[in-house]
């Protein structure tokens, strides 16, 4: 089956699932394709039904599942741009800024800049800086991360020592400087040298040196440079802490970087089990679609277990 025909067939399957309000099938279809291909499916959907999938989900209401599907079936660069505007409109949403700015590839950031300018008639970086003075280390991290200006430092041992000094002295500015200028390939080597010398993980050292929000921002940046899936796992774990959980964070990460973070279910093992944490934190109406999207567990087994418990 050629690519365009396949998109039409998938669009029909998605439409049938939406008409039947079959959340499991919708989630399975959504998670099967990368975001770029979902856009092709959405176009085929529009040609056949004269409406976009996201618009049909909007008619369902404003629940967690609907919100997640709306984001997943919207162009991810457009979605990121709109969420960034929400994050700086009114009270600053620092959690959203970490999710949206730190967990973003260079190519995705360039596309987001274009969409932001198109929708809001102002440059994204300028708008963020107007609304967020860099008066805290985590804000400076966001500010400088937006430049995506990295280079090879070519001195791993020296940089590992600088990192050690910055952490021992609680020097947030120095931590920011090395995080925002180092290429991912070299960051891994610097971290390995640091951890070999100190015999403790960098995350542990960051948590000891920075008890405030810098802890979250610095750890997210550190993990994104090492492996995007580790950053997703770290923040999803944070989102699953507490009684209610932070669905907005989980929704942002799932809809924007799922394709780039499919190792998340494996690296999450340092915190526990991804599927179990989703089910512990959210109702099954929300947790099961999330588990399906992240391919964290066999959905058929979950449904069978639920059926056995009922009977």
UniProtKB/Swiss-Prot annotation:
The keyword Cytoplasm applies. One of its GO terms (molecular function) is calcium ion binding. Transmembrane segments: none annotated. The keyword Ribonucleoprotein does not apply. Keywords: Annexin, Cytoplasm, Cytoskeleton, Microtubule, Repeat. One of its GO terms (biological process) is cytoskeleton organization. It comes from the Eukaryota. Annexin repeats lie at residues 5-73, 75-146, 154-223, 227-295. GO terms for cellular component: cytoplasm; microtubule; plasma membrane. It is found in: Cytoplasm, Cytoskeleton. Belongs to the annexin family. Giardin subunit alpha subfamily. Giardins are involved in parasite attachment to the intestinal mucosa and in the cytoskeletal disassembly and reassembly that marks the transition from infectious trophozoite to transmissible cyst. They may interact with other cytoskeletal proteins such as microtubules in the microribbons or crossbridges, to maintain the integrity of the ventral disk. PANTHER family: ANNEXIN, ANNEXIN B11. This is Giardin subunit alpha-8. It comes from Giardia intestinalis. The lineage of its organism: Eukaryota, Metamonada, Diplomonadida, Hexamitidae, Giardiinae.
């Amino acid at each position: 089956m050629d690519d365009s025909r396949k998109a039409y067939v998938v669009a029909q399957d998605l439409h049938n699932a939406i008409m039947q309000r079959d959340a499991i099938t919708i989630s399975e279809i959504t998670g099967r394709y990368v975001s770029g291909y979902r856009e092709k499916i959405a176009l085929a959907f529009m040609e056949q039904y004269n409406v976009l999938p996201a618009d049909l989900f909007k008619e369902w209401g404003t629940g967690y599942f609907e919100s997640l599907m709306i984001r997943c079936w919207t162009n991810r660069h457009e979605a990121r741009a709109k969420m960034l505007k929400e994050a700086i409109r009114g009270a600053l949403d620092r959690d959203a800024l970490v999710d949206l700015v730190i967990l973003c590839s260079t190519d995705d950031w360039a596309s987001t800049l274009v969409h932001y300018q198109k929708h809001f008639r102002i440059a994204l970086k300028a708008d963020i800086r107007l609304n967020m003075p860099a008066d805290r280390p985590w804000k400076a991290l966001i500010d400088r991360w937006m430049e995506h200006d990295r280079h090879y430092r070519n001195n791993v041992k020296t940089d590992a020592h600088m990192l050690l000094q910055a952490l021992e002295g609680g020097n947030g500015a120095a931590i920011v400087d090395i995080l925002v200028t180092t290429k991912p390939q070299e960051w891994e080597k610097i971290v390995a040298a640091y951890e070999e010398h100190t015999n403790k993980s960098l995350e542990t050292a960051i948590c000891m040196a920075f008890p405030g929000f810098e802890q979250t921002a610095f750890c997210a940046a550190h993990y994104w440079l090492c492996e995007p899936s580790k950053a997703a796992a770290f923040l999803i774990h944070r989102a699953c802490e507490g009684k209610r959980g932070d669905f907005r964070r989980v929704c942002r990460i799932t809809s924007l970087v799922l394709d780039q973070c499919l190792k998340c279910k494996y690296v999450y093992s340092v915190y526990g089990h991804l599927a179990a944490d989703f089910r512990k934190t959210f109702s099954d109406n929300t947790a099961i679609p999330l588990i399906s999207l992240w391919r964290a567990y066999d959905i058929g087994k979950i449904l069978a277990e639920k059926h056995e418990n009922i009977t």
